[in-house]
Amino acid sequence: MIVDTFTNRGSTFFSKLSTVLFFLCAVITFQGVIQRREVELDTPVYVHYAKYRSARFYHAFRNVRQQYAQVKFNMDADLSELWDWNTKHVVVYLVASYSTEKHEKNQVVVWDKILSSPEESKMFMKDTLSNIQAHPFNEYSNQFEGKNATYTLHWTVSPKMGFLSWGAGPGSYEIPFHKIITQPK
């Protein structure tokens, strides 16, 4: 019986290789947890207005008229501090926070963008409208009237190896929702 066959040597080699790679991944993940840095970015978002109207979207799960809001904003942000050697991509999103009678805190994503490289992390956006098709911002009580929302820029850093990290910039001042009155044709 031959003990040192090609199959046995290959099995031993790949067993040791997978063990080394496993411990290397564990060390990198542990290092990411230890060296996790809290990044404080001053990235204000200036919201011009938040408007709403009644509409019926047939692709929605309920075929009823609902109030949908749309937000127009400016943003000048430099998120390059979020990048290091282990960053795969950064997801940036604008969150509207408001309260209702039933719920103390409601948070809705009204805009998002995936940054795949550090060059994309310098963002200058002027008069940008939230996409009502990608992020339908509706209130199930159908009462945007009299409500104010605070808008905050959030980010999630996805590492190549390790755990997600996230953060948020300063919130804007409260912006009231304005109703759009459509003229009959």
Swiss-Prot record:
Organism of provenance: Schizosaccharomyces pombe (strain 972 / ATCC 24843)
Family listed: Belongs to the SPCS3 family.
UniProt keywords, alphabetically: Endoplasmic reticulum, Glycoprotein, Membrane, Signal-anchor, Transmembrane, Transmembrane helix
Localization terms from the record: Endoplasmic reticulum membrane
GO biological process terms, semicolon-separated: protein targeting to ER; signal peptide processing
Assembly mode: Component of the signal peptidase complex (SPC) composed of a catalytic subunit sec11 and three accessory subunits spc1, spc2 and spc3. The complex induces a local thinning of the ER membrane which is used to measure the length of the signal peptide (SP) h-region of protein substrates. This ensures the selectivity of the complex towards h-regions shorter than 18-20 amino acids. SPC associates with the translocon complex.
Gene that this sequence comes from: spc3
Entry membrane topology: Single-pass type II membrane protein
Any Pfam family the entry gives: SPC22
Transmembrane segments: 13-34
Chain ranges on the Lumenal side, renumbered to this chain: 35-185
UniProt entry tagged with the keyword Endoplasmic reticulum: yes
The protein's name in its UniProt record: Signal peptidase complex subunit 3
Function noted in UniProt: Essential component of the signal peptidase complex (SPC) which catalyzes the cleavage of N-terminal signal sequences from nascent proteins as they are translocated into the lumen of the endoplasmic reticulum. Essential for the SPC catalytic activity, possibly by stabilizing and positioning the active center of the complex close to the lumenal surface. Essential for viability.
Taxonomic path: Eukaryota, Fungi, Dikarya, Ascomycota, Taphrinomycotina
One term under GO cellular component: endoplasmic reticulum
Glycosylation sites: 148
PANTHER family, A to Z: MICROSOMAL SIGNAL PEPTIDASE 23 KD SUBUNIT SPC22/23, SIGNAL PEPTIDASE COMPLEX SUBUNIT 3
Keyword Heme part of the UniProt annotation: no
Domain of life the protein comes from: Eukaryota
InterPro entries: SPC3
Cytoplasmic compartment segments: 1-12
